[in-house]
């Protein structure tokens, strides 16, 4: 027999245990078309429940967020029809919901035409030149018409205006007063034309190509005029420089002639020859001045004249080397080498003077002095090279390692620890490729071998000196005295080429004097003095480990500086010991106070910026969690807050608390120790009141939550110590490093039962334990070890 009703309806045919879905269908009479799903809520009007539907009656906090809460959910317009009309008309015009590529683009013609003449006019007024008026007139006369006929007419007008302006410029150069009046009139006319053209051009379009052609034409013509003016100024300047140079050379030549006449009468003929050379130079200079008048060949003539002048200057220097009595200077312009002679020396002391007659010409003097001059020039050039490498090179050339080419060689392959100077310098090198062995040791190598190896493996030849200085760490080329000695060794004494024997004797005498000084200086040190010997003996007597090797010494009693409180273990004066102890206590006290003040300051700053990581460094209470939620709810400037990392139950508690305040939680950070929760406000936060019943239920749960991203404070572990028996303080006994366990324990009394038992068995004081006294007489010593230095 089938059942009357199923499980869902619970007897839909009129059973008393359950109602039917269409219960109202049978009861309704009259209007049967009405939907059976209608309820009492639809029948009743909303006017009966105005208090529930009015959003203004809900409590919302004051401020900006309160205003947002009131307006939330309301329509933009008062009626639905107005809102529908608004959305229908702005369906395709609301660009906020469309992408950029779907938005239409409209091109609107500008009301005013862009005219670049305004900018050009301002620039010409700022940088006014003698051609400024011409530029103004030319740019103002530019037309912006599209038709070709108008552009051609404008070009003709511009050419006529240019001719008129050139005539005006010629008149202005002749008479200044007339130019001023003309400029004023031109300015007035140009301003009128400028205003007229602006009014006409504002209504017309302009052609860029025509404007560009006209501007290029005018700028090229103006550039030609400026170049011509610069060429004229350069020619005048060069003529002035040449005249000044001739005056200086004539003054120098006059001073040289006067010095020769005052020194001796033997150089009269030489002075005449020199005056002839000077006259030739003056003639050559006059010819140069005539050549300079031609503009086309100006550069070539100036180069030839400079070459001739340099050759004549060199000849003059060679002549001065042989015949100047006051001083002999070699290449004095480069400051290379100079040697002074006294005024009273005779002519025979000058090199090359024996072979020269007073009546000889200048050519004979220069020919006979060539060998000596070559030697001098070679010597001076070598010295100049060394001076440049020693002085100028460090300033201009960077150290090794600052250029890209320096990294072609691996510097770690070679290591130099010492250098030996001699006939052939040697380096104490450690290099596997150079030695050919894998042994990590140093070997002596000649400098030539090291240089060959280095150059073959990537070091540039011009960077070799810097490389050696870098590898030897300043052992080579670091002293200026050595470089000066090398320069002195290569210098050649030109005056004493024939006096070799005398120079050798002088050198021997100097060496003997140096040896005597060195020998006498050796005896100054008191070898037999006993200064400090008594202190050394006293130290060896008092020191317990003075003669013990470092590996065998016992450092177990050394107290670290952090844990030191006294200086009793030091053998120092008691007054000094008390002073050090007092200073140490003050230092530790001040350090603790500073640390405490710094932590308090950090906590205050964290409270101001609501940083929970500093406010709650170890744990957070459930009361503090609720206080943070209340502060966030009342603070209108904040919209979110982040809690420290807690365990899973703590995160679940925070999530439940956020639901009570109608807020959301987000998981942030990495999974694990870095995982934390971020609580944020929502729209519902300002619509509804917090569920304080559920909040109170959560408050009755777990009271404390520890942070899992921080280790527990070790001080808390120390406080949880088991109290020792018989100790009033309740703490354990503390031992120091190296203390003997039970060293201060008293001897076992005879009343002890264990001792009485041993005595009855035949044991007496001083005997060993075990069968026939085979055991040890003294107990094994046990030392306390707190450090991690190993077993001693």
Swiss-Prot record:
Biased composition (Basic residues): 1-11, 24-35
Segments for region (Disordered): 1-47, 139-209, 225-327, 343-364, 494-530, 709-734
GO CC terms in record: cytoplasm; nucleus
Domain G-patch: 750-792
Stored Pfam families: G-patch
GO MF: nucleic acid binding
One GO BP annotation of this record: RNA splicing
Bias type Basic and acidic residues, positions: 234-248
Domain R3H: 619-683
Localization, UniProt: Cytoplasm; Nucleus
Biased composition (Acidic residues): 145-209, 277-316, 496-515
UniProt-listed SMART domains: G_patch
Superkingdom of this protein's organism: Eukaryota
Role of this protein: May be involved in splicing.
Designated name of the protein: Protein SQS1
Species: Lodderomyces elongisporus (strain ATCC 11503 / CBS 2605 / JCM 1781 / NBRC 1676 / NRRL YB-4239)
Gene this chain is encoded by: SQS1
